[in-house]
Amino acid sequence: MKSLSKKKRGKFWLLAAMCVLLLCCAGCKDDVQLKLTTGLNEGELFRIEKKACTEAEARLFLMNQKNEYENTYGENIWKAEVGETTFAGQMKDQLQAFLYQLKGMVLMAESRGITLSDEEKGLAAVAAKEYMAGLSVEAASYLGMTEEQLTQLYQEYRLAERLVTQVTAIVEDEISDDEARVIEVQQIVFSKKKLAEDGRLVALSATELADVRAKAQEAADRAAAGDSFTLLQETYSSEPVGSIRVSRFDVDKAWENAVFVLGKEEISGVIETEDALYVVRCVNNLLGEETQTNKEVIRQRKKAQIFYQEYNAYVAKLLVQNKEGGWQSVAFTNWVPDCDVDFYEIYESVFHADPQ
């Protein structure tokens, strides 16, 4: 539950403000009507109504992400398996979704009469100039974008931010300590599933489940009698021994209702959820620092819910035209030049500079 540093805040702002990580809104394009076409202008990947996204814009965000991930995890990260696809495939899907969403948000902002001031337009030009000045000749050639086009992209990003701010302004700033409360607990876990011979997780039989419930009750009785909870974890639990820190939004409702009423050192009875049974000991019923941090997480989650209610209703009416085969040239496995400038960090430094 760490908060973002000021340097990183702008990098994740648009999507973090909607309670998701950068490029993690895969599936947004499913809310609009998709149509494959060959009728787009040269260099365009898709259009949402009259708002186009260019191949150069996709290359910019791809270059930004590709360099960051490779610097952190190495070049082989793209081959890593993620479910039924690779990390490269997953990131490409998320890049597509991010671009669909960005263009949709710009249209929505314009439909609501949101416009940029002359000062904001000037800041967009400053950001574009700084970005272009930091590109190597090789990176500039790969990008294939003029300073004017990049200025327009920074303006669109600003419009999207303004839209989120306007739509989510009704979210109250005050989040109670109890709503945001983070606690520390130890728990004994009894899974209601088992590993089948073919490697799948399957539900326990009725007889097996009855045995598990009996063991859970035995553990609860021993805990109530004063036996060492750590030793009981070692004896009974299907999960590692130790303590965990959780908020209300991390857990099943039945678990929340049973555990968040416990005081320090108090122990629950047997708690049953869909997937497991638990016996829980409360180590600390209020972690102050973590609770304060969690308030911002909750605030952003509420903003996300409000924003997407309006956004999804708006984009459901829009028509998207996709260039047939256009995305084949945009791939994280393709060669991309090194780039020392970051679109998001420049946006943050220009639009959210600390007052002097």
Q: What do these predicted regions represent?
A:
Residues 214-255, 289-290:
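Peptidyl-prolyl cis-trans isomerase
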Residues 33-145:
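N-terminal targeting/tethering segments
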Residues 1-9:
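N-terminal secretory signal peptides that target proteins for export/translocation
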Residues 9-20:
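Sec-dependent N-terminal signal peptides
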Residues 30-41, 48, 139-208, 251-356:
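PPIase-associated folding chaperone regions across multiple families
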Residues 53, 57-64, 86-95, 99-107, ...:
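Extracytoplasmic/secreted proteins, especially bacterial periplasmic and envelope-associated proteins
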Residues 23-27:
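C-terminal motif of bacterial Sec signal peptides marking the signal peptidase cleavage site
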Residues 62-69, 99, 103, 107-116, ...:
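Sec/Tat-exported extracytoplasmic proteins
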